[in-house]
Amino acid sequence: RAILEGSAELIKEGKKAFPEIMIPVVCDVAEFRNQAELVKKVYPDVLAKYGLKKIPYMVGTMIEIPRAALLADKIAEEAEFFSFGTNDLTQMTYGFSRDDVGAFVPGYLAKKIIPVDPFQILDQNGVGQLIRMGVERGRSSRAGLKVGICGEHGGEPSSVMFCHRVGMDY
């Protein structure tokens, strides 16, 4: 409601507003649909409150759970865009808690168990394959699906290059 009302206020001031409402941490299309319905439910109320005929908006999701990447084709049937939350996706793929990595990742790096800290540099072989799969599957059911990255990896050059190679928009 707050996002739509803020957008309505901008429109009433003569400004453009086109919010992209992102539903986080979904694992299934049914869960996404359930949350997207909440947006659809308040939309007419906001229009009436502000005397508007339309507020353009999109509803998408963060792909942060490995299961969501695997089911991206189904989720994209409903979601209008994806943003890959690479911090949580890395955590859930590895089973590492970000709160505890300082206690063991330095040892893993020293022993060459892992080549880099996966929370600093995107693991292209594991997490990256979930991302590639999610992008491909999402676009297989929604051509032109807007896809991007959200997380610390978005500021790391090799991670950004990988995201560009798999076809992300941002």
Which functions belong to the PLM regions below?
Residues 1-170:
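Conserved alpha/beta-domain cores
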